[in-house]
Amino acid sequence: LKTDIKPVGKSPSGVNIYSFQYKDMEGTYEGVMAHEVPWASMMNDNGYYMVDYSKLDVEFKKLN
């Protein structure tokens, strides 16, 4: 689960980009919200959505 979600911009194609933290992980990350990119999202076996960043013009990044 993501926490501390903050908008940081948009990709060239208009996809919203956010910074966020994961509840059970250290660090801050940058990426998208799966519900905003259904063409690039899938549900994993645990019931959480995952994003296939190869279908987007956004790079998933660990900021710190």
Task: Give residue ranges: language-model regions.
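C-terminal intramolecular chaperone/autoprocessing and neck/assembly modules of extracellular spikes
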Residues: L1-N64
